[in-house]
Amino acid sequence: MNKKLLWLGSGLALTSLSAYAQKSHDVKPNIIYIMCDDMGYGDLGCYGQSYISTPNIDNMAKEGMRFTQAYSGSPVSAPSRASFMTGQHTGHCEVRGNKEYWRDAPIVMYGNNKEYSVVGQHPYDPEHIIIPEIMKDNGYTTGMFGKWAGGYEGSVSTPDKRGIDEFYGFICQFQAHLYYPNFLNRYSKSMGDTAVVRV
């Protein structure tokens, strides 16, 4: 008899905990993930740096969460972002360098573009789900600002095709390396864009 009551009590407790957990999960947290090229672990005040003031990011870290055991997937930008987006180790991810795709010549040496009809990097494999798609599937509105480098214009992997609602930045990261970029890209669901456009 006592065993039955114990199991019944455990079942009620688990049901209550489950209902409480469900209630607390109804409100999704806002997620802002900041990834920067060439930034070291100790370059922000929230990680102990005291020479340069970084109050806004420090405040975000204080109100949110900090990664204290996160490491870059690669020492260069496109593969590092690809490692984060796909959840794959750099050795398993197709994006392994900052190769540029340009027009009909698949790979262009860095900086040799004379005109910019189609530019970008190696596309993420459309068979692999990436972070923005996971977020969309879980009811989030998604935005990305800065370097995409997960495909070239018109490829199978541009922000509009990979779960991003609002994008403003560079499809081709080469443009981000110029003091005066030739163009920026935008995809805005709220503005009625149906594909990535140049602005």
Residue map of PLM features:
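Formylglycine-dependent sulfatase
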Residues: 2, 8-13, 20-199
